[in-house]
């Protein structure tokens, strides 16, 4: 793996996830979170002459990592449009779909992108820099109740109402544009011993709202269910409870709400069988090499 790709993002659970795709040399595969190309390169190394891989990423920075391989096609798009682009490329069904839902190290470490509270910079957080809504737009324009709901639902923050109130009060004087200005408002609401964890939750909540992550994930999972061949694999790495719940539900019941449908006779109609009944997590060696992998959970299901 080249240096640029390693600095962009270290692939998490690389062997476990690609093994879980059950790759055949002449199969058709999709990596819906191309990023630093770590998983994609491993998939390509297992393909033969008839094999094909599509890699999705909405971030223009990921285009620097495009793989020069005749079996690879890069799709610059949000993975919520999976089905549209499969049709565009004349692909009816695929053999496996991989999604690593973690934010790339590149995003956290680039101060201009605004994903981390470790750096000052614009309060941005857009995965797609061409998209309109930024984190600054949210904190400056959303009503107090809506802000509180975002922090409660997407950050699971107990003091969501206090946060929203403090933000609305502060912005009455002047707009909040930088991470530094934002931290001055919210830091006093957290105790020093839990400050980093709570700030991470605030930034997670804003990032999810900016990028419509839950809506996009729901649409991608539904599209993946339709796109997979019988025997095809859905392989997903999650990093927080909100996305993990959706993935677990669709694999167990066929929808993200977790409500399994039944046929006329009351038999459960579930599209998948679980390949791993217990989630796969990084071992201590991987966590030591890549601390950001600590919260990763890998789930694998096979289409019936």
Swiss-Prot record:
Q: Where in the cell is it found?
A: Cytoplasm
One GO CC annotation, please?
cytoplasm
Enumerate the UniProt keywords alphabetically: Cytoplasm, Methyltransferase, rRNA processing, S-adenosyl-L-methionine, Transferase
UniProt entry tagged with the keyword Phosphoprotein: no
Molecular function as annotated in GO: rRNA (cytosine-N4-)-methyltransferase activity
Recorded catalytic reaction(s): these are: cytidine(1402) in 16S rRNA + S-adenosyl-L-methionine = N(4)-methylcytidine(1402) in 16S rRNA + S-adenosyl-L-homocysteine + H(+)
- Classification via Gene3D superfamilies: Putative methyltransferase TM0872, insert domain, Vaccinia Virus protein VP39
Q: Which cysteines are joined by disulfide bonds?
A: none
One Pfam assignment: Methyltransf_5
Q: What class of enzyme is it?
A: transferase
**Biological process annotations from GO:** rRNA base methylation
Q: Give EC number(s), comma-separated.
A: 2.1.1.199
| UniProt keyword annotation of Cytoplasm present | yes
The residues that the entry says bind S-adenosyl-L-methionine are 37-39, 57, 79, 100, 107
The record's comment on protein family reads: Belongs to the methyltransferase superfamily. RsmH family.
Tell me, what does this protein do in biology? Specifically methylates the N4 position of cytidine in position 1402 (C1402) of 16S rRNA.
Q: Which NCBIfam families match?
A: 16S rRNA (cytosine(1402)-N(4))-methyltransferase RsmH (TIGR00006)
Which HAMAP family does the record associate with it?
Answer: 16SrRNA_methyltr_H
Put simply, this protein is called: Ribosomal RNA small subunit methyltransferase H
This protein's species is Bacteroides thetaiotaomicron (strain ATCC 29148 / DSM 2079 / JCM 5827 / CCUG 10774 / NCTC 10582 / VPI-5482 / E50)
